[in-house]
Amino acid sequence: MTSTRYEGDTWDLASSVGVTATMVAAARAMATRADNPLINDLFAEPLVKAVGVDLLSRLAGGELDPAELNDVHDGAAGSAGAMSRMADNMAVRTKFFDEFFLNATKAGIAQVVILASGLDARAYRLAWPAGTVVYEVDQPQVIDFKTTALAQLGAAPTAERRVVAVDLRDDWPAALRAAGFDPARPTAWSAEGLLGYLPPEAQDRLLDTITELSAPGSRLATESAPNPAPGEEEKLKERMQAISQRWRAHGFDLDMAGLVYFGERNEAAPYLAGHGWRLNSVTIRDLFAANGLDPLDDDDTRMGEMLYTWGIYE
């Protein structure tokens, strides 16, 4: 399951970058079972179990308490690194993007593009206005698996769902147009949980391409972490490796530090602002507070400053 990124690598939902989509879905399942849930994703648990990664299936189904995966290096229960906060983290993230799409479509946007859609089931669970077209873009194996699994569950999309089975490193704009996408119409775009898995220059290309394909009035939502302070990158890698080691003790072999791209990069919000987008941003720490969740610990500065950004192309 574990592997370091390399040129031209591919994956399914049980390997490499693909399994992070399954992790995210497991967290959505956990968040859905919370006493006062912020989100309601009833497709998350069955999709995770269909993938079949044992640890994630047990987390999604409630058979494993995520606190069992914590250790003393996570700090207190309020730490963003603590697995017991995994569901809270994903709840506020999911709610943010859900509300972004619902607000965009209420404003009259009828064309939606979800980049790196993974096990995202928004095309099935959100109350889309009539006439909305949702394009899901991801690796062919990921698209095929989710489409089949949801059909087996008897699920029906609540919008017109069009799949675009293409690697984002390939000519995905051509594939998107071939599926019926019209760049002359305003679009609601999401790049959720994506930017950190791209090299810095690829992130810029992606944001440039989104801008090129956006008619005035288009909207975009994404999230990004600040560049690490001097010396912080190695500490972050060590922490990720420690978490991966604990996962291995439960039979889940994934090297998170080998999947993301480190190094200096343009932060998404100022980069987009310089390319014609009028933006708003909020930190994940602010989202926790706004949703009545216990605050993150002060030692989680970088995670607490994760910036959620949305805006309109002018």
Curated annotation (Swiss-Prot):
It comes from the Bacteria. GO terms for biological process: methylation. Keywords: Methyltransferase, S-adenosyl-L-methionine, Transferase. Belongs to the UPF0677 family. Exhibits S-adenosyl-L-methionine-dependent methyltransferase activity. S-adenosyl-L-methionine binds at residues 138, 167-168. The keyword Flavoprotein does not apply. The keyword Methyltransferase applies. Its EC number is 2.1.1.-. This is Putative S-adenosyl-L-methionine-dependent methyltransferase MAP_4191c. PANTHER family: S-ADENOSYL-L-METHIONINE-DEPENDENT METHYLTRANSFERASE YKTD-RELATED, S-ADENOSYL-L-METHIONINE-DEPENDENT METHYLTRANSFERASES SUPERFAMILY PROTEIN. It is an enzyme of class 2 (transferase). One of its GO terms (molecular function) is methyltransferase activity.
